């Protein structure tokens, strides 16, 4: 059985948290506003995985009203969600992620992001695709007010 999941997340710049994408700390003049570490890649991926497995969403599993998730490393959340999904017999086929941001450029960090995901999900880096794009200065992302991420996953059981 094939199961497809889709996840989306967005965070606003302007907070005091460092910019973390895919578990990688990226130098940026702007911080992120968030309850956890604000990692849009991890959050959209968790939502995609949970969706494919019909296990709800990140907000239900890790509510931002719970103080224990304040400042938490989103890689930890990913590992918890993935354990729940694999306990149901799901296997990961592939991941496709698009990070949408005007600044900063992240191409030099993509290999490290893929490595983190492959470690956390116990899969090959060849099952993970990560790319970045801009909005050509349009909208809140184009004005460098925030970043977004879309993740699509394919699971089998």
UniProtKB/Swiss-Prot annotation:
It comes from the Bacteria. Pathway: Isoprenoid biosynthesis; isopentenyl diphosphate biosynthesis via DXP pathway; isopentenyl diphosphate from 1-deoxy-D-xylulose 5-phosphate: step 4/6. It catalyses: 4-CDP-2-C-methyl-D-erythritol 2-phosphate = 2-C-methyl-D-erythritol 2,4-cyclic diphosphate + CMP. Its EC number is 4.6.1.12. InterPro entries: MECDP_synthase, MECDP_synthase_sf. Its cofactor is a divalent metal cation. 4-CDP-2-C-methyl-D-erythritol 2-phosphate binds at residues 9-11, 35-36, 57-59, 62-66, 133-136, 143. HAMAP family: IspF. Belongs to the IspF family. Involved in the biosynthesis of isopentenyl diphosphate (IPP) and dimethylallyl diphosphate (DMAPP), two major building blocks of isoprenoid compounds. Catalyzes the conversion of 4-diphosphocytidyl-2-C-methyl-D-erythritol 2-phosphate (CDP-ME2P) to 2-C-methyl-D-erythritol 2,4-cyclodiphosphate (ME-CPP) with a corresponding release of cytidine 5-monophosphate (CMP). This is 2-C-methyl-D-erythritol 2,4-cyclodiphosphate synthase. The gene is ispF.
